[in-house]
A protein has these predicted regions:
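C-terminal subregion of chymotrypsin/trypsin-like serine protease catalytic domains
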Residues: 2-19, 53, 66-84, 91, ...
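Conserved H-D interstitial segment of serine endopeptidase catalytic domains
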Residues: 31-32, 55-58, 77-80, 84-121, ...
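Extracellular/periplasmic catalytic domains that process cell-envelope and extracellular macromolecules
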Residues: 43-48, 71, 84-86, 102, ...
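A conserved glycine-rich beta-strand in the N-terminal activation segment of trypsin-fold
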Residues: 48-52, 56-74, 123-124
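Acidic glycine-/aspartate-rich tracts in secreted/extracellular proteins
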Residues: 58-60, 82-86, 95-100, 133-140, ...
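Active-site loop architecture of trypsin-fold serine endopeptidases
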Residues: 61-62, 120-122, 154, 167-184, ...
């Protein structure tokens, strides 16, 4: 049986020399018939994704990492737990299309971060966190994304199209995140299909997966970024993990399923639909 490493899609660098690392989990790949090729996403236009957030995460004095996130309220950013776990501070970029050219920028400390109490870094379960920021003024380039209604909690979304966005690597050969915001339209697959690749111990009801036909996929540096329904713009997931064999190899990409955490989000932010 072939083994593959599943990784959280976070890109980290040190100031001395850029280095890519990920938090690894070795799992059996049950379906090894997939193939893929590198196909970049599309470049976003200014204001196309006004809820997109960029996060520069200070890990230590000499190292930092990049993740994505989404603005869900005028004081709240939603992202992945594996992005914020152990960070010293976070610089939040709002309203940007070019990665660090933002309409508004805030730096907050670790005390402004709420990580899910049951986050498990060894299995990537409950990979979700919140960042509280100073109140932001909405504009054409800064808007909150809509979250799923509680009534839709049991929807699988299988077969629907969704849009993922972020500044992550645009190819497996890239060594750093991209400057310009990228996006891709992806097809949601059932968890049963996704589990054929990663196994049922990894893919659970709190995940949502997409196919990466043609090698179009999320990649390192996209972690925590939004997955929204193409039909409505409602955010249903946040980028969590993929396969270490490569972003463009055709293996499914996995997200944290937001309908599993609507109560948690409401408890901590007061936001609900």
């Amino acid at each position: 049986m072939k083994f593959l490493v599943v990784f959280a899609l976070l890109l980290a660098t040190t100031y001395a020399s850029p280095v890519l690392y990920q938090r690894d989990l070795v799992v059996p790949v049950l379906d090894d018939s997939l193939e893929g090729r590198i196909t970049n996403g599309e470049t976003a236009s200014a204001g196309q994704f006004p809820y997109q957030v960029g996060l520069s995460l200070k890990l230590s004095t000499f190292s930092s990492a990049w993740c994505g996130g989404s603005l869900i309220g005028n004081q709240w950013v939603l992202t992945a737990a594996h992005c914020t776990d152990g960070v010293k501070s976070v610089t939040v970029y709002l309203g940007a299309t070019v990665r660090t050219s933002a309409e508004a920028t805030y730096t907050v400390s670790s005390s402004d971060i709420i990580i899910h109490a049951d986050w498990d870094s060894s299995t990537l379960k409950n990979d979700i966190s919140l960042i509280k920021i100073p109140s932001v003024t909405y504009s054409s380039k800064i808007q909150a994304v809509e979250l799923p209604a509680v009534a839709s909690s049991y929807s699988t979304y299988a077969g629907e199209s969704a849009i993922a966005s972020g500044w992550g690597k645009i190819s497996d050969s890239a060594t750093s995140v991209t400057s310009n915001l990228q996006y891709a339209t992806l097809s949601i697959i059932t968890n049963t299909v996704c589990a054929r690749t990663y196994g049922t111990s990894i893919v659970t009801s709190s995940n949502i997966c997409v196919s990466t036909t043609g090698g179009v996929s999320t990649c390192n540096g996209d972690s925590g970024g939004p997955l929204v329904l193409a039909s409505s713009g409602v955010q249903i997931g946040l980028t969590s993990f993929g396969a270490s064999a490569g972003c463009a190899k055709g293996y499914p990409a996995a997200f944290t399923r937001l309908t599993s955490y609507l109560d948690w989000i409401q408890t901590n932010t007061g936001i609900s639909y």
